[in-house]
């Protein structure tokens, strides 16, 4: 019985060491991305670290810190009062062209809630009077929580090379409530 207990203890310690190493790797990668101002990538690593449920609050604190940085560096507020967008409907938000010197470091910050009972994709398109400059897709999870989406739009060539004046959101196969949408920049 003692041998079995010792084996179980060793196995448990090995599992804890593996989780600890994985957590430390995610935190290290998140911190590197944070220092490089790649906030979207930093959040991915911090989210993975938080999902390990180690009891540490650091990953959540860093995600909140990034969200605060982005909100403090807001360039354009596109949604401040909640709006709903029905499935497969498109809603366009207009703004003045962003200063060319800050475009490469731009993010779109969206706080949104899934109003449907399934996960789905949402298309984010952007452009100007000349037409559509580009688009990307984000996954909307199957939960009814308000989720933060931080999209590094400045990494897209047509975002920083064109004078874009609108962003469109199109939820595909699900309804969504947008509580906040801003164009922001890393500090």
Regions found by a protein language model. Give the residues of each.
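Short carbohydrate-recognition loop motifs
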Residues: 76-91
């Amino acid at each position: 019985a003692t041998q079995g207990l010792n084996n179980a203890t060793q196995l448990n310690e090995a599992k804890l060491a593996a989780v600890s190493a994985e957590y430390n790797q995610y935190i290290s990668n998140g911190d590197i991305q944070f220092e490089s101002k790649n906030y979207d990538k930093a959040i991915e690593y911090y989210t993975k670290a938080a999902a390990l449920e180690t009891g540490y609050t650091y990953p959540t604190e860093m995600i909140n810190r990034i969200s605060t940085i982005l909100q403090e560096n807001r360039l354009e507020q596109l949604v401040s009062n909640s709006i709903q967008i029905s499935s497969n409907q498109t809603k366009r938000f207009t703004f003045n062209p962003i200063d060319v010197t800050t475009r490469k470091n731009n993010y779109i910050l969206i706080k949104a809630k899934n109003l449907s009972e399934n996960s789905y994709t949402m298309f984010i398109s952007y452009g100007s009077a000349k037409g559509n400059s580009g688009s990307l897709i984000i996954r909307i999870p199957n939960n009814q929580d308000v989720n933060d989406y931080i999209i590094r739009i400045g990494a897209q060539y047509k975002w920083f090379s064109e004078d874009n004046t609108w962003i469109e959101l199109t939820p595909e196969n699900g309804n969504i409530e947008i509580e906040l949408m801003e164009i922001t920049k890393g500090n």
